[in-house]
Amino acid sequence: MLKITVVTPNGTLYDGEVDYVVIDGNAGQMGILENHVPVIVPVKEGFLKLVKGETEVFYYLSGAILEDKLNVVTVIAQEASNGNTI
């Protein structure tokens, strides 16, 4: 299980646990699973997908960076919105 926090200048959008995360990085789509090697990657403008069991939550990100270290994922974005409503 991963602990993930998604934050913007306006506050925290998501803080919880997920099975895995999918982002659009500069090198293409990237999945983060439990025990992934630590990374810091810029995130392309697009969707962040959070999956827990059968539930999928999407956020649309702009100007974001992701850090994964020891199963703790932090996404810091200049702008983000609920992607399930776009």
Whereabouts are the PLM-identified features?
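Compact, glycine-rich, soluble single-domain proteins
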Residues: 2-86
